[in-house]
Amino acid sequence: ERVQKAETTSENMELSEAETRYLIDEQLRKYGWEADTNNIRYSKGTRPQKGKNFAIAEWPTDSKVSKNGYADYALFVGLQLVGIVEAKKANIDIPSVIDYQCKDYAQLIKPEHNEYVIKQWGSYKVPFVFATNGRKYLKQIETKSGIWFLDLRNNSNAPKALQGWISPQGIMELLEKDISSANATLQNTPFDLLRDPDGLNLREYQIRAIEA
């Protein structure tokens, strides 16, 4: 009964994927992304630009999962590919979209787009993926509401629901945390281990950079 009530009060409408994307456009813009499904799209010539935070619609990948491999949005901070977003209809289980679709897109970035890849985490060329139906998060219908997010940089991470989108600045702060964590690990590693051929086997100039 509680689930039925939540479903009827949540926007009280069934949106198509196209309608969902218009809703997501508006949400992304509120968080600092430049988003416009009709105009900021790959097929109309939009490409990443320095100083721009683009959510580029219909970004092509080599995925064979669905829609000829087009991700609904690719998120760029300047020239850096930082996220993939999938939009779904209201009756779709959102976390499952991350598992079977978003992950596939994040692995199968086209070779000609590698210039936008920050780095690779295992088989993933994109750090963050999102899936949503545009509906506000409701605990009663948890898997069919909210913005679901997965940080692909660590295999132990699981999808989780967010109350809102992450801004371009927030994305860069998340990426910086990853860098800071790696640097902290190096800073706390004994220099003998850094030099050890059976350890990290770093060169002297690399060790000096860590000491600096």
Question: Which residues make up each language-model segment?
Answer:
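ATP-dependent helicase/translocase motor core
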Residues: 1-212
